Amino acid sequence: MKKTSEFVYYHPWISFGLTLLFLFGFQLLNIIYGFDIHDTGFHLVAYENVFNAPDSVTYNFMYYLNTLLGGAIMYIFPDMGVLGFRIVGALLVLFTLLIIFVTLRNTIPAIHLLLGSILVVAGYVNLPYSFNNGILSCCLYAISIVFLYQGLFKENKILVLLGGFIVGINIFTRIPNVLAIGLVFIVLLHKKCFQKVYNVDWKSSFYFLIGVSLGILAIWGIMVKMGHLGVFLRGLMAVFSMAGGEGSHNLIWMLKIHFAFYLSAIIPLLVFYALIHIGKCVERKKNKFIILLFYVVSVLSVALYVYETRWVYIIIWAFLALGCIICALRNRNQLGVLGIFALYMLLFEIYGSDYGINHGSFPAFLAAPIASMQLLDRKKIVYVLTFILAVCWQVIRKGNFQDSGPIYQKTEKINCLETKGIFTTKENAYAINTTLKGIKPYVSVGDTMICFPSAAMMNYLTHTRPAGGMSVPGGTETSFVLPIEGTPIVLFNKVPFSGNGWTETYKLDDKYGFDIKSFISEHNYRKVYENDYFILFVPPVS
């Protein structure tokens, strides 16, 4: 391990380049494997319609910046498909890591920047990920803090302004990112708290807020120019309506979820504490083999357990939060300020997801290298690598988000240009291929089609438009879509949720799809196609 640390110290750029290659290779395992008909489709159908039919994807305008950029990429490269947008997502993550390495390598040792990078990417459970609002939000959040931090300590107001500008535009990636404006309090008090200078930094705070305002005005101006402002405001009203509703996006529900998430981090912290003290007792034996065996077995057990129960985020989050807190308490200098910035991102970037932790390890872009620096010495780095390797093995063994099963079982392709280069299970490929073939005589490009409850990918694969402004009408609040204007085609998924078992068939609850079934009955729809997975209904011929 000593030789590795010395190589990184003397050759930081070569080491970082090799790390990026490793991380891209790791992501490649998940770029080409796994097929998701819900989340990925939700974004892709928005990119396809943001310019030519924005009203059909109104709900996506709560992620306006992401939708706009995705639409621009699809407009320039119309044949990218699912694979292309997965590559874009992976490259965006690597670009963010590059920015962090370039700007912070004089503050944080290169070995910890590299370890942090590996931990962030390897710790992301919900693979494969495509270019989406979650990734863009985390990347812009981290980049804004890096510029803000550099601006404060280089006394460069342009960088502070730029950091604020990125915060401003990032509000339109996810509306809850408005909480990032709270970074102004760190800017305001950083001298008083960490530099023992008893005054507040009004000037930097002013530049930061001006930057935020310019960012908001820039996106607002784009909306006006593109004719998107009305659609955005309607989508925003729907979001506020959902916050007061009874679904998973209810405000009180999300507050409870986040509070529960923070409480759940206490258990891993206690486990860390216990293992550290047991480890000290083992070290007194002064038997190197026993010491190594204890730590490796402990780390492997923890890694395999948390990944098996999908709580890897919590144990990583707890470790990183502890590192940021220690950094702030130990360092009454620039590094302490960076620790507070990283902790703020770790705490608040995740807010707004209905299950709190759905952005995975990406909110830890800054916290990971800081925690590595504070909690790990050179001898303990091998245990972090053991944890990372265990997680990598679990990714290969357990499969992908919404497409479970080992990667090596995903050998089939879907017969569609948009999914070229993507492999999935035999069952999934059969389900999509037979459905696309069966509905083809009844569905044309540009038609309006409801994919109930949340099979948005079917809209994208058929190049149809969602109805009522929502491509996942059963994925959040059905009241947002219904009542529906006109009589669109209805593709009814027989499985209640498009998750890991979306090709499974079982007896449905009578309440499942009650609203859409009532709509179909009321308007005398005809069933024209059915298989084990989907039913296609078309309106009566006028």
Regions found by a protein language model. Name each.
Residues 87-109, 143, 274-277:
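Transmembrane-helix motifs of polytopic, lipid-linked glycan transferases
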Residues 124-125, 159-175, 181-186, 214, ...:
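Membrane-interface alpha helices of multi-pass inner-membrane proteins
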Residues 105-110, 142-162, 170, 194-196, ...:
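Membrane-interface transmembrane helices that cradle and orient dolichyl/undecaprenyl
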Residues 29-46, 57-73, 79-83, 225-227, ...:
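Extracytoplasmic catalytic/substrate-binding loops of multi-pass membrane glycan-assembly enzymes
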Residues 129-138:
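Short acidic/glycine- and proline-prone juxtamembrane loop motifs at membrane-interface regions
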Residues 100-123, 289:
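Transmembrane-helix signature of polytopic, membrane-embedded enzymes
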Residues 398-478, 486-498, 531-537:
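Short periplasmic/luminal acceptor-recognition loop of GT-C membrane glycosyltransferases, typified by
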Residues 147-169, 198-210, 287-294, 333-342:
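Short hydrophobic alpha-helices at membrane interfaces in multi-pass membrane enzymes
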